């Protein structure tokens, strides 16, 4: 068969998970392309398919498997792999670890235990799968993240045991890395039920955040002249649920600020022309994803 990567539909993008060895990609951060077409892979890039690329090898045959790769400029590389058929006394079948949490890929499936529930719509997984799931306290250890998910899966938490005030500061997080640090995931709150939608397996849990964001001036100080500055720069940070929004004004007028997510900085350019007074009162309000808020105020002077 052949693969022609000139173009493919945006709606097909997620199916690229079936074109590569996804488990290898997640474990080693390197993409290995499959030279056969797995089930539930409707990508339109495949041409001249014969037996979906699968080979029938017997002990009576030897042949050469040829791979030809070319780029858009016509450069070409050829790899030839000799294959010799060989008879084995027995072939050990692949071990399939069974669990109580079986998902038929063609059917919607739901699990619920200890106040946590999971809904998996039909065709969310690419193939029938036994999931490894553990419900521990306010956490769900939800399979392994080297298994791809095609459609959003919903995870729900019953938070009835928490007071309405405590619920305001709770959010759903995914734990990541060696130290299992919490990372905020979009949390939908309705009464005593919190839900999130995800296309990544992993550990999900409830986390409390009562600490407000931090704001610090970077290139100016309170009640100082900054006539030579071309910008106002501030550092904003939230170590809990993460920053949801920010708002900055000078003398009560809204000013445009650019947020650099990687550096955690807010920058306003004086070229915008909003700051026209000599004495200026800056106010910056930063709010995190559970409503904790910090207000930063400073006065600066500037010749115009």
Where are each of the predicted segments found?
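Short proline/glycine-enriched turn/loop motifs at strand-loop junctions of beta-rich domains
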Residues: 113, 123-127, 135, 163-167, ...
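Short edge beta-strand/loop segments characteristic of extracellular beta-sandwich folds
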Residues: 121, 156-160, 231-239
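Long, low-complexity serine/threonine/glycine- and acidic-rich segments characteristic of extracellular
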Residues: 1-88, 191-196, 237-304
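N-terminal non-catalytic regions of secreted/periplasmic and cell-surface proteins
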Residues: 207-241
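Proteolytic processing hotspots in large secreted/extracellular or virion-associated proteins
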Residues: 90-95, 103-104, 127-171, 222-228
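Extended Gly/Ser/Thr-rich low-complexity repeat segments
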Residues: 153, 168, 201-215, 279-287
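Proline-centered linker/hinge motifs at extracellular inter-domain junctions
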Residues: 101, 109, 210-214
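Proteolytic-maturation and junctional protease-sensitive modules
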Residues: 146-204, 245-247, 253-256
């Amino acid at each position: 068969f052949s693969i022609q990567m000139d173009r493919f539909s945006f709606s097909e993008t997620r199916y690229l998970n079936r074109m590569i060895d996804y488990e290898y990609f997640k474990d080693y951060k390197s993409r290995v392309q499959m030279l056969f077409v797995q089930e539930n892979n409707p990508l339109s890039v495949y041409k001249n398919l014969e037996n979906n690329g699968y080979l029938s090898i017997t002990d009576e045959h030897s042949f050469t498997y040829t791979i030809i790769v070319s780029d858009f400029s016509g450069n070409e590389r050829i790899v030839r792999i000799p294959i010799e058929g060989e008879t084995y006394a027995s072939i050990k079948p692949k071990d399939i670890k069974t669990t109580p949490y079986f998902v038929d890929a063609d059917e919607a499936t739901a699990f619920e235990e200890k106040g946590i529930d999971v809904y998996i719509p039909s065709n969310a997984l690419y193939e029938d799968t036994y999931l490894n799931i553990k419900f521990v306290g306010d956490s769900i250890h939800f399979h392994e993240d080297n298994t791809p998910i095609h459609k959003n899966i919903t995870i729900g938490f019953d938070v009835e045991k928490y007071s309405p005030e405590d619920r305001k500061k709770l959010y759903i997080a995914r734990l990541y890395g060696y130290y299992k640090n919490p990372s905020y995931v979009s949390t939908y709150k309705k009464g005593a039920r919190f839900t999130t939608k995800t296309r990544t397996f992993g550990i999900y849990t409830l986390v409390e955040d009562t600490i407000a964001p931090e704001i610090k001036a970077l290139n100016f100080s309170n009640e100082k002249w900054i006539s030579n500055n071309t910008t106002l720069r501030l550092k904003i940070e939230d170590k809990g649920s993460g920053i949801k929004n920010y708002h900055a004004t000078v003398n009560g007028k809204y000013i445009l600020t650019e947020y650099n997510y990687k550096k955690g900085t807010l920058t306003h350019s004086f070229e915008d022309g909003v700051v026209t007074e000599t004495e200026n009162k800056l106010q910056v309000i930063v709010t995190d994803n559970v409503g904790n808020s910090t207000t930063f105020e400073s006065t600066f002077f500037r010749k115009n």
